């Protein structure tokens, strides 16, 4: 087989994880069967570790499925036959069944009830030397106090979280408000500049109209002069009109 075959690397990790999970499962079963041998903290820790290990094994089995798919896509590269692939698939199937059996036993109603009873006993600090009436009252009194402390702690955490969210929202609102103020000032300045430019354009338009009117009058007068006779008055009139035109142009440039 090829040295690059990734199946055996993942398979070794899965086998180690299964051995660890089986040890945890055995300890977890012992704790539930004999409540006097452990505290509630040990049961909770063992239960969480067992669940995490089973979940990790399931993920590793998915990786093994992917390696088989890779090998099946290119069998020549890994030099594997159908028999070897069947063996690998059988390993994945059997391991997955082992994990499923442990998860099923952990999720049965009887086991859950036993675990709850053990947690309740550890919380209450059960003692066989007390009589029924006194022991029962003390148990439930301690249970109520523990529940009240747990509820108070939960409420405090929720209030602190809500306060943090409110503070973050206030900071965001302040940032948004500042941005809106900046945009408002910018829009006001832009609006004022546009109004000033509009007034300037309007004045310039009036000046152009006035100048155009003056030029039209001059052109009309020049047209009339062109029809005059070529005597001395004609030349005088032309000179005068030319002077007027020159003055108008100078005024236009000055204005």
Swiss-Prot record:
Domain t-SNARE coiled-coil homology residues, every copy: 163-225
Example GO molecular function: SNARE binding
GO cellular component: clathrin-coated vesicle; cytosol; early endosome; endomembrane system; Golgi apparatus; Golgi membrane; nucleoplasm; perinuclear region of cytoplasm
Keywords carried by this UniProt record: Acetylation, Coiled coil, Endosome, Golgi apparatus, Membrane, Phosphoprotein, Protein transport, Transmembrane, Transmembrane helix, Transport
Cytoplasmic side: 2-234
Region feature (Required for interaction with VPS51): 2-168
UniProt record similarity statement: Belongs to the syntaxin family.
Protein name per UniProt: Syntaxin-6
Organism: Homo sapiens
Gene it is expressed from: STX6
């Amino acid at each position: 087989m090829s040295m690059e075959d990734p199946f055996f690397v993942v398979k070794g990790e899965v086998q180690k994880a299964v051995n660890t999970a089986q040890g945890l499962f055995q300890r977890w079963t012992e704790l539930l069967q004999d409540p006097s041998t452990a505290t509630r903290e040990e049961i909770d820790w063992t239960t969480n570790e067992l669940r995490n290990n089973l979940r990790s094994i399931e993920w590793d089995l998915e990786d093994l499925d992917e390696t088989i798919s890779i090998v099946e896509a290119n069998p020549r590269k890994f030099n594997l036959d159908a028999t070897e692939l069947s063996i690998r698939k059988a390993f994945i199937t059997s391991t997955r069944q082992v994990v499923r059996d442990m998860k099923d036993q952990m999720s049965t109603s009887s086991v859950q009830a036993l675990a709850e009873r053990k947690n309740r006993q550890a919380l209450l600090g059960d003692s066989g030397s007390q009589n029924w009436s006194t022991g029962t009252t003390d148990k439930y009194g301690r249970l109520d106090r523990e529940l009240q402390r747990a509820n108070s702690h939960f409420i405090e955490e929720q209030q602190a979280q809500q306060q943090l969210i409110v503070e973050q929202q206030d900071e965001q609102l302040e940032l948004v408000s500042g941005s809106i103020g900046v945009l408002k000032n910018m829009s006001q300045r832009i609006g004022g500049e546009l109004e000033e430019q509009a007034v300037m354009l309007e004045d310039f338009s009036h000046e152009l109209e006035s100048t155009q009117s003056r030029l039209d009058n001059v052109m009309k007068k020049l047209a009339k002069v062109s029809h005059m006779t070529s005597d001395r008055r004609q030349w005088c009139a032309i000179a005068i009109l030319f002077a007027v035109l020159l003055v108008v142009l100078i005024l236009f440039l000055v204005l």
